[in-house]
């Protein structure tokens, strides 16, 4: 393979990916396109559909080399629906001025293109000293049941886990180089259904008001300060998101009440411990209550070490900024990867992600490519 065949231009690849209408759960040809590019660079590729046989979730894993250090780039090709009112066709990959427009350019087809271009530039210098892989899912913007989680489990079963993973989420709020994510809070939702006895409001002694029991339980839950934060995390937060009784009458005590809450928790807690606490409080106020808990991810932290330092130095060398190490924001697929290897997140500027006219500056695509290349070189590849 000659150097001229390597896809070193991130803009060209990003535009090709943007033209694939991969609104989750559809793929739109994005992963086949990417697989073809990677195979042309010498990667071994695996198409890994998971989920229902009639509508499987597309996933792509590609690896070049077998040695160590073993670096993985994780990302996704699915995008959220574009909505209405765009100035340009959201799948036309229009360049206007110094910006590239398209659904998913920031989150995160642009990041995928930059990493591929960085690997291409590294290969122009000679063979890798270790191995590089890509884990690309089509189920990040959806339920995330059949994407990164089963793929990383598949890698573990094969004994093919990386030493370190970079997730290319758009971590930067305003400018490239703002933030590297080294952890994320855990997230859990609880649905509490309290059953009472329906009755007339004039005869409360003949009824059992479930709303009062639910409010008492939620008052105790919200009164507790979960923690004051930890070294890398802000304080955990419990928020009541709804209380529903379905009662349109003014003179009826309802027979049941349903409350919902969410907890974003730091590394001082586990989902299991918080679940036990919620159940204990609720059942003291409403012994017959039904509590259903869904934990979408545990809190995790990658302690700053050699790899994170190397990534930070790569960012600084290209942008002149020293990125802030951060754990804020919502959940990401890093919650699945962190159970198997160290992971940090760094990608493009996310100011327009999920918005109408999503776009990035063309220069940031080149700069992110240079950052990924500098990181690979510093990491020993």
From Swiss-Prot:
Its EC number is 3.5.1.18. Pfam families: M20_dimer, Peptidase_M20. Binds 2 Zn(2+) or Co(2+) ions per subunit. The gene is dapE. Zn(2+) 1 binds at residues 76, 107, 169. This is Succinyl-diaminopimelate desuccinylase. Zn(2+) 2 binds at residues 107, 141, 354. Coiled coil: none annotated. It comes from Gluconobacter oxydans (strain 621H) (Gluconobacter suboxydans).
